Amino acid sequence: EDISLESLLAKNALETRWAFNIPTLARKVPGINGGHLVEIGARPNTGKTSFHASLVCGPGGFADQGAKCVVLCNEEGAHRVGARYLTAALGKDVHNISQNKETALQKWQMMKDRVYIKDSTGKDMAWVETLCKTFKPDVLILDMGDKFAKTGGFARMDEALKANAIYARQIAKMYDCAVLYMSQLSADAENKVVLNQSMMEGSRTGKAAEADLMLLIAKNPPVEGQDEEDTQRHLNVVKNKLTGWHGIVHCDLDYKVGRYTA
């Protein structure tokens, strides 16, 4: 390997090829690059799908930056994930978009050329690797990452998830793409704002050990008498080999259009 001063500086300058479009996050972790494994976790109904939809299709997102993005969804239907990407791209809910199709068409057509969404129910990581060979994505989203794991041959689930994360990291490095690995958090994270690595569902240390960056998304606990859910979200940066900063940054989720803003 070339470890000359020029080479090291040049390679590290590329660490933020794909910039985050959430200002509070970008100030601490500017972005990601090919070869990075980013593990993202949250409790159900926190906004995991909206999070990656906003990063990819929101204003200044990965697609706007020219990244070829592949989204593999094995939980929600591809059409539902696609709708989240559509609203994040256009900043309007589906009803408003349907009322103004001609206005929406040009913007969405440009996004659609850079974003590929595919149902991957029942598939494994070997299938994911084959797809990467063909499509050569810049950014690969696994939603949900754990559901690509093969459980046969492992004594415990955490061992299977560790092997799955190792495979995801190998794909990131071999095919020079940034992999966003979406995960559920365990019940330990319910109604908590400050989260940690041990709250990953079904995992011990192994899965977390593979990540270059780990972001855990929290929301404010409900308050008695509250008519609707608080839109504030808290991004816990619990592992960060990219810039070394750890802590919590705050933002808001516009759930009607699936955009994270700050």
Where does each model-flagged region fall?
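Conserved H-loop
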Residues: 74-76, 177, 181-184
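C-terminal regions of RecA-like/P-loop NTPase motor modules
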Residues: 109, 125-140, 170-175, 187-262
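Conserved, well-folded catalytic cores of nucleic-acid-processing
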Residues: 59-62, 88-92, 144-151, 171-174, ...
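Hydrophobic/aromatic beta-strand patches that form the interior of the parallel beta-sheet core
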Residues: 38-40, 70-72, 118, 180, ...
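Conserved inter-motif catalytic segment of the P-loop NTP-binding fold
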Residues: 6, 65-155, 163, 228
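The Walker A/P-loop phosphate-binding site
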Residues: 1-92
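A short alpha/beta connector and helix-capping loop motif
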Residues: 154-168, 178-182, 215-216
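Catalytic phosphate/metal-binding cores of nucleic-acid and nucleotide-processing enzymes, i.e., regions
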Residues: 25, 142, 177
